Amino acid sequence: MAEETIFSKIIRREIPSDIVYQDDLVTAFRDISPQAPTHILIIPNILIPTVNDVSAEHEQALGRMITVAAKIAEQEGIAEDGYRLIMNTNRHGGQEVYHIHMHLLGGRPLGPMLAHKGL
Protein backbone atom coordinates (compact mmCIF):
# COMPACT_ATOMS: atom_id res chain seq x y z
CA MET A 1 0.00 0.00 0.00
CA ALA A 2 1.16 3.52 -0.75
CA GLU A 3 2.28 5.84 2.00
CA GLU A 4 -0.14 8.37 3.42
CA THR A 5 0.17 11.93 2.09
CA ILE A 6 -0.71 15.40 3.31
CA PHE A 7 -3.93 15.05 1.30
CA SER A 8 -5.00 12.14 3.52
CA LYS A 9 -4.78 14.47 6.52
CA ILE A 10 -6.80 17.13 4.69
CA ILE A 11 -9.52 14.57 3.90
CA ARG A 12 -9.73 13.66 7.59
CA ARG A 13 -9.57 17.37 8.54
CA GLU A 14 -6.51 16.79 10.69
CA ILE A 15 -4.78 19.85 9.24
CA PRO A 16 -6.32 23.19 8.25
CA SER A 17 -7.51 23.59 4.69
CA ASP A 18 -10.14 25.64 2.87
CA ILE A 19 -12.40 22.73 1.87
CA VAL A 20 -15.02 23.80 -0.66
CA TYR A 21 -16.64 20.38 -1.20
CA GLN A 22 -16.54 16.96 0.44
CA ASP A 23 -18.61 13.80 0.13
CA ASP A 24 -17.98 10.08 0.57
CA LEU A 25 -15.88 9.84 -2.63
CA VAL A 26 -14.02 13.13 -3.14
CA THR A 27 -12.73 16.23 -1.38
CA ALA A 28 -12.02 19.62 -2.97
CA PHE A 29 -10.01 22.42 -1.39
CA ARG A 30 -8.24 25.64 -2.35
CA ASP A 31 -4.58 25.33 -3.35
CA ILE A 32 -2.23 27.01 -0.86
CA SER A 33 -0.11 28.37 -3.76
CA PRO A 34 -2.74 29.42 -6.30
CA GLN A 35 -1.68 29.78 -9.93
CA ALA A 36 -4.94 31.50 -10.94
CA PRO A 37 -7.69 33.46 -9.16
CA THR A 38 -9.54 30.16 -8.75
CA HIS A 39 -7.24 27.20 -8.04
CA ILE A 40 -8.88 24.24 -6.38
CA LEU A 41 -7.58 20.69 -5.96
CA ILE A 42 -10.07 17.85 -6.31
CA ILE A 43 -8.96 14.50 -4.90
CA PRO A 44 -10.43 11.05 -4.38
CA ASN A 45 -10.85 10.16 -0.71
CA ILE A 46 -9.09 6.86 -1.37
CA LEU A 47 -5.32 7.03 -1.83
CA ILE A 48 -4.36 6.38 -5.45
CA PRO A 49 -0.72 7.46 -5.92
CA THR A 50 -0.71 8.17 -9.69
CA VAL A 51 -2.95 7.90 -12.73
CA ASN A 52 -0.91 4.78 -13.58
CA ASP A 53 -2.37 3.14 -10.46
CA VAL A 54 -6.01 3.67 -11.45
CA SER A 55 -8.18 0.59 -11.95
CA ALA A 56 -11.83 -0.10 -12.73
CA GLU A 57 -12.69 0.01 -9.01
CA HIS A 58 -11.80 3.73 -9.00
CA GLU A 59 -14.15 4.76 -11.83
CA GLN A 60 -16.91 6.09 -9.58
CA ALA A 61 -14.55 8.36 -7.62
CA LEU A 62 -12.81 9.59 -10.77
CA GLY A 63 -16.12 10.33 -12.46
CA ARG A 64 -17.25 12.19 -9.36
CA MET A 65 -14.10 14.34 -9.56
CA ILE A 66 -15.24 15.61 -12.98
CA THR A 67 -18.83 16.31 -11.94
CA VAL A 68 -17.63 18.07 -8.78
CA ALA A 69 -15.24 20.18 -10.89
CA ALA A 70 -18.14 21.37 -13.04
CA LYS A 71 -20.25 22.12 -9.95
CA ILE A 72 -17.45 24.10 -8.29
CA ALA A 73 -16.72 26.01 -11.52
CA GLU A 74 -20.36 27.08 -11.57
CA GLN A 75 -20.28 28.09 -7.88
CA GLU A 76 -17.05 30.04 -8.40
CA GLY A 77 -18.57 31.91 -11.36
CA ILE A 78 -15.99 30.66 -13.88
CA ALA A 79 -18.01 28.06 -15.81
CA GLU A 80 -19.23 30.37 -18.55
CA ASP A 81 -15.87 32.00 -19.34
CA GLY A 82 -14.02 28.71 -19.02
CA TYR A 83 -11.52 26.90 -16.87
CA ARG A 84 -8.82 24.25 -17.07
CA LEU A 85 -8.61 20.81 -15.46
CA ILE A 86 -5.13 19.32 -15.08
CA MET A 87 -3.81 16.03 -13.69
CA ASN A 88 -0.04 15.59 -13.45
CA THR A 89 1.50 12.12 -13.34
CA ASN A 90 4.93 11.24 -11.96
CA ARG A 91 8.10 13.34 -12.01
CA HIS A 92 8.20 14.37 -15.67
CA GLY A 93 4.51 15.23 -15.51
CA GLY A 94 5.10 17.58 -12.59
CA GLN A 95 3.38 15.53 -9.87
CA GLU A 96 4.50 16.67 -6.42
CA VAL A 97 2.06 14.88 -4.09
CA TYR A 98 1.60 11.18 -4.83
CA HIS A 99 -2.16 11.11 -4.27
CA ILE A 100 -3.84 11.77 -7.61
CA HIS A 101 -5.45 15.16 -7.79
CA MET A 102 -7.04 17.37 -10.38
CA HIS A 103 -6.32 21.08 -10.53
CA LEU A 104 -9.30 23.32 -11.36
CA LEU A 105 -7.92 26.66 -12.58
CA GLY A 106 -9.83 29.68 -13.81
CA GLY A 107 -10.83 33.25 -13.26
CA ARG A 108 -8.61 34.73 -15.99
CA PRO A 109 -7.30 33.76 -19.45
CA LEU A 110 -4.84 30.93 -18.78
CA GLY A 111 -2.64 31.07 -21.87
CA PRO A 112 -0.94 28.14 -23.60
CA MET A 113 -1.00 24.68 -22.07
CA LEU A 114 2.79 24.25 -22.09
CA ALA A 115 5.77 26.55 -22.23
CA HIS A 116 7.30 26.30 -25.70
CA LYS A 117 10.86 25.18 -24.98
CA GLY A 118 11.31 22.80 -27.88
CA LEU A 119 11.08 19.05 -28.02
From Swiss-Prot:
Phenotype upon gene inactivation: Cells lacking this gene fail to grow on both D and L isomers of alanine due to a defect in DadA dehydrogenase activity, preventing D-alanine utilization. The mutant cells do not have appreciable nucleoside phosphoramidase activity. The loss of hinT results in failure to grow in media containing 0.75 M KCl, 0.9 M NaCl, 0.5 M NaOAc, or 10 mM MnCl(2).
InterPro entries according to UniProt: Histidine_triad_CS, Histidine_triad_HIT, HIT-like, HIT-like_sf
Any GO BP: D-alanine catabolic process
Enzyme superclass (EC): hydrolase
Record key words, sorted: Hydrolase, Nucleotide-binding
Pfam families: HIT
Annotated function: Hydrolyzes purine nucleotide phosphoramidates, including adenosine 5'monophosphoramidate (AMP-NH2), adenosine 5'monophosphomorpholidate (AMP-morpholidate), guanosine 5'monophosphomorpholidate (GMP-morpholidate) and tryptamine 5'guanosine monophosphate (TpGd). Hydrolyzes lysyl-AMP (AMP-N-epsilon-(N-alpha-acetyl lysine methyl ester)) generated by lysine--tRNA ligase, and lysyl-GMP (GMP-N-epsilon-(N-alpha-acetyl lysine methyl ester)). Is essential for the activity of the enzyme D-alanine dehydrogenase (DadA) and is required for E.coli to grow on D-alanine as a sole carbon source.
PANTHER family recorded: HISTIDINE TRIAD HIT PROTEIN
Quaternary state and interactors: Homodimer.
Protein name, UniProt field: Purine nucleoside phosphoramidase
